[in-house]
Amino acid sequence: ARYVHVDWNDTPLQRARLQYSQPDDLDFFPEFEVQRHRQMVDEQWARLALVGPEFPDLLNDVDPVAMRRVSQVRIQKLRFYMQAQMANQLQWCVAAVPTPAWAQKVFPHLAADEAVARLWDVILHTVRADLPDPVAAWRRHDEQLQRVTRFLAHNQVQSLHFFDPTPGADGKPASDLHVGLTDHSLWLAASSLTPEGIRFLPNMPTEEVFSAPHNQRTTGYVRTSRPCFPLERRVEGAYFRFEAGEIVAYDA
């Protein structure tokens, strides 16, 4: 690379800002950040995001309104960058790196160093880095997922049914959700192409194939079976009920 710029996200600093800033100061977003991201788009910088929570519970008691306010300002100011990224004008990839706190949540029976080593083993296996030729393995995997997308497109799938028979607190299946697709749905998977024809993998690992739903054809309900972290806050048992594409009830 001609030049590597490193951005470091620090959760304790983020917490300090959210706790001690004056409310109006939460709307501040420096102009130099806007210009830096604009240069990255203009010059088509590649982006590698290495993610791993060092303090996975540190923001649990922070005001969610303040967190949402900071996030919304950033999204608004950098919308052009996110649009360029989602349009594959830039090469980008998100990959996971173990941290002691995260590793011990996954392997609570192990000491910190042992848990980190074990999580490294799992991650390197899931990204095929433990195979003799990882690049060739990823090309095969990418092609397999592309075959799945072609099959789904050819058969004109009309809807997806997400069903989890595990009984919930009310005795009903945990999830029973019908997601209707558009009349001419498109399917994507794994690798993406830049306008110049450069192929890249935005996520490692990646196993999904995906499409876009019709905005009025989702009906039923869904519960999360694993913890999720919107705005870096741990949420368990999230529940959403849909009617004609709209959320009519939710809980967690």
Predicted regions and their residues:
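Conserved AWS/pre-SET-to-SET junction and N-terminal core of the SET lysine methyltransferase domain
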Residues: 201-239
